[in-house]
Swiss-Prot record:
GO terms for molecular function: phosphate:acyl-[acyl carrier protein] acyltransferase activity. GO terms for cellular component: cytoplasm. It is found in: Cytoplasm. Disulfide bonds: none annotated. Its EC number is 2.3.1.274. The keyword Aminoacyl-tRNA synthetase does not apply. Pathway: Lipid metabolism; phospholipid metabolism. Keywords: Cytoplasm, Lipid biosynthesis, Lipid metabolism, Phospholipid biosynthesis, Phospholipid metabolism, Transferase. Its main location: cytoplasm. It comes from the Bacteria. Belongs to the PlsX family. This is Phosphate acyltransferase. Pfam families: FA_synthesis.
Length: 339
C-alpha cells in the first residue's frame, strides 16, 4: 500500500480541487492510501459522507496554516511551520507518507522540501523535471525553474538525475540525454554549457550532445537538460503556444456557417489533437535530488490534473526513484574519482 500526503490547502483552488481529485485517485487505485493535510473542519465539510467509502485509505491530518501563493519562500519556511505544505512534507520525513503532492507556491515548496528532507549525497541543488508533449510522445525537461543560475557541475548533476528518473519510471534502459544550447555545434554556447558537455561525455549516461529548442517538441531526445531560467521560459512559452493554437483553431472554425460544418466533420481529429497537447495530462513536476518524493502540481490544476500528479507520485514511489538516484550518484562519483 502506497501512502501519499496531499497539501489540501495549496494552489489556486485548495480543497475544492484536491478533495475530488483525491477521491478519483482512490477509486482508480485500490492500493493507494491518501492523507489530506489541512484545516480539518474545512476538509470534513468537503468530504461529508464520502470518506466512509474508503475506510482507512483516506484520512485527514490537521494543519492550522496555509502557504499562500504570494508568500516569500524564506518567510513560509520560518514562520509557517504548521502549514499544510510543511506538515505534508514532514509526514514524508517521518515515514508516515511515501510522497507529497502540492499545488502550492513553488518557491516555498522547494525551500521547505530541501530544508526538511535534505538533498541526496552528491547533489548540490534539487531540480524540477516534468514531461512535455512531443511528436514522438513526450520529452522530460529539467530544470524548470528551481535554479536560475547554474554551473556546469549543476547541469551535470541534473542530467544524471533525469537519466535515472526516466530509466526508472519509463523502464528505458538507455534514454537519450541532450544539453540545450543555441546550436548543435561544439563551438556554440557559453562556458558553462561547454564544460557541462565535457563532463557528460564521461558520465555513463547516454549523452548525445547539444540540442536546440525545437528538439524538445520534435522528441529528438528523451531528456533535455538546461538551467532553470531557460527551462522555465521554454515551458511557459510552450504552454502559451498551445493556448494560442487552440484559440486560433476555435476562432477559424466558428467564423462562418461553412467553417462550422467543416469543424463538425473534423471534430474527431480536433479532439485527438486537443488531447495530445492538453497540459493537464502532463501535470506533475518532480523535485529531483531530495531524500524523498515531492511532486509539484500546477497551481491552477483542475481535479483531473491534480489526480495525474498523484499518479506520478505513486509511480515514483513504486520505482524507488530517490534511492536509484542516490545509487547512481554514488557510482558516478566513484568513477570520476578513479578517472
Amino acid at each position: 500500500m502506497t501512502t501519499i500526503a496531499l497539501d489540501a490547502m495549496g494552489g489556486d483552488h485548495g480543497p475544492k480541487v484536491v478533495v475530488p481529485a483525491a477521491l478519483d485517485s482512490l477509486e482508480q487505485n485500490p492500493s493507494l492510501r491518501l492523507v489530506l493535510v489541512g484545516d480539518e473542519s474545512v476538509l470534513r465539510e468537503y468530504l461529508k459522507d464520502t470518506r466512509r467509502r474508503f475506510g482507512d485509505r483516506l484520512r485527514v491530518h490537521h494543519a492550522s496554516e496555509v502557504v499562500e501563493m504570494h508568500d516569500q519562500p524564506s518567510k513560509a519556511l520560518r514562520n509557517k511551520k504548521d502549514s499544510s505544505m510543511r506538515v505534508a512534507i514532514d509526514l514524508v520525513k517521518q515515514g508516515d507518507a511515501d510522497a507529497c503532492v502540492s499545488a502550492g507556491n513553488t518557491g516555498a515548496l522547494m525551500a521547505i522540501a530541501k530544508f526538511v528532507l535534505k538533498t541526496l549525497p552528491g547533489i548540490d541543488r534539487p531540480a524540477i523535471i516534468a514531461a512535455v508533449p512531443s511528436m514522438t510522445g513526450h520529452t522530460h525537461v529539467l530544470d524548470l525553474g528551481a535554479n536560475v543560475d547554474c554551473t556546469a557541475e549543476h547541469l551535470y548533476q541534473f542530467a544524471v538525475m533525469g537519466y535515472e528518473l526516466v530509466r526508472a519510471v519509463e523502464e528505458r534502459e538507455h534514454p537519450t540525454v541532450g544539453l540545450l544550447n543555441i546550436g548543435e555545434e561544439e563551438i556554440k554556447g557559453n562556458e558553462q554549457v561547454k564544460r557541462a558537455a565535457e563532463l557528460l561525455s564521461g558520465a555513463h549516461v547516454n549523452f548525445v550532445g547539444f540540442v536546440e529548442g525545437d528538439d524538445i517538441f520534435k522528441g529528438s531526445v528523451d531528456i533535455v537538460v538546461t538551467d532553470g531560467f531557460v527551462g522555465n521560459v521554454a515551458l511557459k512559452s510552450s504552454e502559451g503556444l498551445a493556448k494560442m493554437i487552440s484559440h486560433f483553431i476555435k476562432r477559424e472554425f466558428s467564423s462562418s456557417l461553412l467553417t462550422r460544418l467543416a469543424g463538425l466533420i473534423a471534430l474527431p481529429v480536433l479532439n485527438a489533437f486537443k488531447h495530445r497537447i492538453d497540459p493537464r495530462q502532463y501535470n506533475g513536476a518532480s523535485l529531483l535530488g531530495l531524500r524523498g518524493i515531492v511532486i509539484k502540481s500546477h497551481g491552477n490544476a483542475d481535479r483531473f490534473s491534480f489526480a495525474n500528479a498523484v499518479t506520478i507520485a505513486v509511480k515514483e514511489v513504486e520505482k524507488a526513484v530517490p534511492h536509484r538516484i542516490g545509487e547512481r550518484m554514488t557510482d558516478v562519483f566513484a568513477a570520476r574519482n578513479l578517472a
